[in-house]
């Protein structure tokens, strides 16, 4: 209890310090006392009593922090009995490359078993949950259908429902919550490891809201019993700079904000910066030599991208590392212009979109987008305005559904 009170007062002191520093920096200006966003995890007073005396399973990675300290370390130091940690794609420490199989291990620092949900099984098994009373989910998401943390959330909820376990969600802001955009996946044939939900490409929900959506829209055979610790002082239009990189290739705020637009290129002949230390801020391909002055060379980077597209070849294209993100925020849209531009500039258009399921005429791009319509529209030269118009019926229907599950304005 003493340690809990100590941490609580440290949090108050930190918040006061931020406000005090603002006053010192601008002594002659009117200081705006905007409420400070406080994540669910940082509101320990709201959930510590609920964890006491229970055997806890924690779904976590490097973004799971209380203050600046790992949630595993913090909760353990506060006397919480964490018996198991479940890690998503990229692993518990967040140092595995995209798509890489992650094995079970024991955390060297705490001795706690770490179960990979991106290895032999994506869903916790009955045996893995047998010695757990409560599951806690605390992972930062970035608001895209093709970012696999929401897949992990569904699998964990399904396992909890099947095994009579409750799920406590420590909610975090969605840095891309301002945008609900892109085509809505409506056909099962486009389901894959990077998309299993009938949402637009960007859904505009936090993890807590998405959990309510999964329960309410019948994604689970039986609803999961959930308890959500909401983010304090937050709404969907508020900017949020992530305190920790959510995955190895989202290593800057610029990359996080560009991710919804640039991740589309993973299903094309264009390299989106993987194999560099500025992923998701640059675009290019060797075939664009002579059409763009900007160039870079993707290489193998352990823990980020071992086999990037166009490895060891000079790529030419676009440098978006200084692109004004405010333009995307104000438009409340993902960008289509870069996709259209680079397709039109690419000399070998027949090989711009990379293969996926050839027997079904589904490209890797289609699996990421959730439909084959966009690919066919790009090839046919349909204008951006008409492409966006074709998305509207699905978007309007989804937005009406989404409204039922929002926890924040």
What spans do the regions from the language model cover?
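Bacterial Sec-dependent N-terminal signal peptides
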Residues: 1-32
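Short internal beta-strands
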Residues: 83-90, 170
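Glycine-rich, charge-decorated loop segments at or immediately adjacent to ligand/cofactor-binding or catalytic sites
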Residues: 94-99, 168-190
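Glycine-rich oxoanion-binding loops at beta->alpha junctions
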Residues: 103-131, 144
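Glycine/threonine-rich flexible loop motifs
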Residues: 141-153
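Conserved anion/nucleotide-ligand pocket segment
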Residues: 190-262
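Glycine-rich, aromatic-lined ligand/substrate-binding cores of catalytic
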Residues: 232-316
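Conserved functional hotspot residues or short segments at active or partner-binding sites
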Residues: 279, 284-390
């Amino acid at each position: 209890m003493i340690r809990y009170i100590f941490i609580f007062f440290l949090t108050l002191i930190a918040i006061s310090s931020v406000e005090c520093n603002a006053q010192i920096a601008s002594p002659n200006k009117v200081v705006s006392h905007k409420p400070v966003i406080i994540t669910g995890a940082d509101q320990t007073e709201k959930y510590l009593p609920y964890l006491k005396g229970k055997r806890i399973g924690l779904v976590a990675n490097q973004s799971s922090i209380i203050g600046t300290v790992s949630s595993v370390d913090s909760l353990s130091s506060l006397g919480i009995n964490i018996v198991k940690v479940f890690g998503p794609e990229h692993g518990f420490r967040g140092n595995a490359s995209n798509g890489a199989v992650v094995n079970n291990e024991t955390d060297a620092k705490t001795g706690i078993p770490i179960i990979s949900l991106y290895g032999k099984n994506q869903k916790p098994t009955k045996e893995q949950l047998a010695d757990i009373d409560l599951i806690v989910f605390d992972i930062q998401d970035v608001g895209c259908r093709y970012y696999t943390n929401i897949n992990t959330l569904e699998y964990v909820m399904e396992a909890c429902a099947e095994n009579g376990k409750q799920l406590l969600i420590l909610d975090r802001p969605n840095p891309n919550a301002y945008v609900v955009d892109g085509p809505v996946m409506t056909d099962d044939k486009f389901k894959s490891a990077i998309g299993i939900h009938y949402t637009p490409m960007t859904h505009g929900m936090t993890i807590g809201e998405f959990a309510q959506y999964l329960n309410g829209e019948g994604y689970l055979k039986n609803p999961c019993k959930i308890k959500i610790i909401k983010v304090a002082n937050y709404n969907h239009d508020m900017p949020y700079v992530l305190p920790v990189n959510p995955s190895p290739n989202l290593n800057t705020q610029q990359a996080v904000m560009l991710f919804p637009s640039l991740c589309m290129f993973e299903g094309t002949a264009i390299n989106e910066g993987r194999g560099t230390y500025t992923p998701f801020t640059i675009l290019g391909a060797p075939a664009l030599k002579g059409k763009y002055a900007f160039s870079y060379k993707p290489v193998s980077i352990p823990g980020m991208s071992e086999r990037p597209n166009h490895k060891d070849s000079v790529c030419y294209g676009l440098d978006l590392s200084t692109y004004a993100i405010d333009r995307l925020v104000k438009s409340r849209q993902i960008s289509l212009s870069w996709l259209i531009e680079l397709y039109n500039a690419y000399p070998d258009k027949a090989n711009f979109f990379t293969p996926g399921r050839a027997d079904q005429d589904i490209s890797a791009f289609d699996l990421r987008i959730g439909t084959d319509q966009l690919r066919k529209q790009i090839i046919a030269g349909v204008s951006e305005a008409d492409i966006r118009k074709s998305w509207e019926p699905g978007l309007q229907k989804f937005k009406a559904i989404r409204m039922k599950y929002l926890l924040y304005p």
